[in-house]
Amino acid sequence: MKLNVSFPATGAQKTFEVMDDHKLRHFYDKRMGAEITADHLGDEWKGYVFKIAGGNDKQGFPMKQGVLTNTRVRLLLKKGHSCYRPRRTGERKRKSVRGCIVDQNLSALALIVVKKGEKDIPGLTDTTVLRRLGPKRASNIRKLYNLTKEDDVRQYVVKRPLPEKDGKKPRTKAPKIQRLITPVVLQRKRHRLAIKKRRVESRKEAEAEYMKILHLRRRQERIRRRSRLSSMRDSRSSIGEERDKEKEKAAVKAAKKVAKKEAKKEVKKVTEAAKKADAKAAKAKVEPKKADKKSADSGKKATAGDKKEKKVEKKAAPAAAKKEAPKRKPEAAKGDASAAKKEKKQKKK
């Protein structure tokens, strides 16, 4: 079994191949993340403490933390799971992984040195591997070197040496620092703020102009409405005046009619009074003549009364005769009449 040992303090790592099963027996039945002493590997490893980071079996399937078995398992994995890198967004895949328990079927075991022992391990603890890539962001560089805002971050960038060429000076390459505050950045910021300020001012001016136009339009609308109301009032008042004039004319006409009627009544009264006076005067003149006529008329009236009585008697006599006469003729009389008619007809023939 291969033991891949890493030492984070120096950044170095080294692989050791151990064939003795007695030395490897101490790793069996241990889980990932468990810490174990390395004294059983030899005297040079005395005092070292390892942490099991993972491993691969003989077919190359990786160990997965949380799978409590020493065999393979097929799991549906997605983004964020270990032992799987999705090729598409949202992709899931069923993969074969090995459990987190160590046994003899592993081909490689990854170990991390948690505690250094008494002796140095050649190629692991005595050599330091420089970081090829340092922090790129300005705030992370300040955090790494504990810098303040006044310090220049560009001097602390981790540079990478380029391969040397014959007859030329050695060259290094440094990454571009992100979020670095420079005069150009400040100038751009000032420019953005100025544009924003101008935009705000232009918006305020446009709003003021709009409000001015709006007030003007509202004022015009109010004036138009007032003029319309006044014209309607004038039209109503003119209509009312015409109606009042018509009413006055009608009242004048009615008064004239009443005056005419009263005048006619007075004239009638006067004429009637005059007629009555004339009639009284005429009566006063006629009364002596009537007295003379009355004596003559008395004899005439007596004769006239006798004539009337005779007429009444004559009228009463035929009425009584009519009452006494029968309504129907007797049958014998009828027969005689019919016989007489027949004789007349025969004579004519």
UniProtKB/Swiss-Prot annotation:
<dbReference type="GO" id="GO:0005840">
    <property type="term" value="C:ribosome"/>
</dbReference>
<keyword id="KW-0689">Ribosomal protein</keyword>
<feature type="compositionally biased region" description="Basic and acidic residues">
    <location>
        <begin position="231"/>
        <end position="251"/>
    </location>
</feature>
<protein>
    <recommendedName>
        <fullName>Small ribosomal subunit protein eS6</fullName>
    </recommendedName>
</protein>
<keyword id="KW-0597">Phosphoprotein</keyword>
<dbReference type="GO" id="GO:0003735">
    <property type="term" value="F:structural constituent of ribosome"/>
</dbReference>
<dbReference type="GO" id="GO:0042274">
    <property type="term" value="P:ribosomal small subunit biogenesis"/>
</dbReference>
<comment type="function">
    <text>Component of the 40S small ribosomal subunit. Plays an important role in controlling cell growth and proliferation through the selective translation of particular classes of mRNA. Part of the small subunit (SSU) processome, first precursor of the small eukaryotic ribosomal subunit.</text>
</comment>
<dbReference type="GO" id="GO:0032040">
    <property type="term" value="C:small-subunit processome"/>
</dbReference>
<feature type="region of interest" description="Disordered">
    <location>
        <begin position="224"/>
        <end position="349"/>
    </location>
</feature>
<dbReference type="GO" id="GO:0006412">
    <property type="term" value="P:translation"/>
</dbReference>
<dbReference type="InterPro" id="IPR018282">
    <property type="entry name" value="Ribosomal_eS6_CS"/>
</dbReference>
<keyword id="KW-0963">Cytoplasm</keyword>
<dbReference type="Pfam" id="PF01092">
    <property type="entry name" value="Ribosomal_S6e"/>
</dbReference>
<keyword id="KW-0687">Ribonucleoprotein</keyword>
<dbReference type="GO" id="GO:0005737">
    <property type="term" value="C:cytoplasm"/>
</dbReference>
<dbReference type="InterPro" id="IPR001377">
    <property type="entry name" value="Ribosomal_eS6"/>
</dbReference>
<dbReference type="GO" id="GO:0005730">
    <property type="term" value="C:nucleolus"/>
</dbReference>
<keyword id="KW-0539">Nucleus</keyword>
<comment type="similarity">
    <text>Belongs to the eukaryotic ribosomal protein eS6 family.</text>
</comment>
<comment type="subunit">
    <text>Component of the small ribosomal subunit. Part of the small subunit (SSU) processome, composed of more than 70 proteins and the RNA chaperone small nucleolar RNA (snoRNA) U3.</text>
</comment>
<feature type="compositionally biased region" description="Basic and acidic residues">
    <location>
        <begin position="260"/>
        <end position="334"/>
    </location>
</feature>
